Amino acid sequence: MFKDFLRPLCYAGLSIALPLSAAPTPTASADRNTLTIAGAEIRLNGEPVKIKGVRMSAALISDDTTRELIDHLDQFRSYGVNTISVYIMGSRFADVKGYRPDATLDPVYSARLSRIIEAADARKMIVLVGCLYWGTSRAREDLAHWTQADANHAIANTVAWLKERNHRNVFVDPDNEGMANGAKQWRIAEMIEAGHAVDPTCIMAYNAKSTPPANADLAIHFSPRIPGKPYIETEGTPPDSNYWGEYSKKQGVYNYLNVGVYTAEMKERQNAATTQHIDGANGYILASTWLQAPPPLGPNMNPGGDGTRDNPGIKWWLEYIRDRPGP
């Protein structure tokens, strides 16, 4: 995306390249929804908000998948969903290659992402923009040469892309579950700094198990909570169920098992965790094989059914957040 006119930007002794010009982008509008943080509070257009979301990590896999998500946003919104998460790279089995080897955004995938963000903004919804996915996925097979500097460039390019399009209803996860940090020892603090160097107002999350850096704006998923800052569970699954383990994966099978299928106990635990994080923290984003499975089993960008084998899906959870008391 940013390959023609570049200028250097230095921070912390590093140098990254940012665009002087790019393809035509939407005109900045005063009526854009804007996400901010005030202390431990998340705010949308200045009003406190609790995150209630669905993890659509494979939404960029095809034009049809992107279109299906957009077509169902109103339905998700009707249940109280106000947030979706979309990943530029990954996720497991989906293998979206949203970053090119030079750390720029692939224009095919970024165009899909922009459509989703615009559609979400029109519905007063928030988008978690996920960047690096360094786990079990073919998404990184062309990036073996990357270094810390390349990772920083990727995050900086992502934030620049968001800024140029005036996408303000977003926050950014630089490194999903600290996977790149664990595999390559790349420092997430530097990635966050790279993003903030481009746009200090961009909300940068921390998503790893080690001590969060001071420059993280909020903690999500794997991160320990940060005193005085928000925390969101951004990949919520049924606790104590080995959901991402043998329940949904099998050696030698390059797709998920039990797609969109839940036991009664799983549902009960998922609902309890949802309430715990909405009432006791800043929100909850559900993750499901129903939403993430690649073809031919998914991705399913719709609610589906009651989570039984005959009627798989996450409608049961959506009905829970719609009907539960409280924020």
Report each predicted region and the residues it spans:
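Extracellular glycoside hydrolase catalytic/binding regions
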Residues: 153-154, 159, 166-318, 322
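Bacterial Sec-dependent signal peptides at the C-terminal "C-region" and cleavage site
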Residues: 16-31
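Bacterial N-terminal signal peptides that target proteins for export
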Residues: 1-12
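Active-site mouth of glycoside hydrolases
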Residues: 34-216, 225-229
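Short regulatory "switch" loops immediately downstream of catalytic or recognition motifs
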Residues: 1, 90-93, 237-242
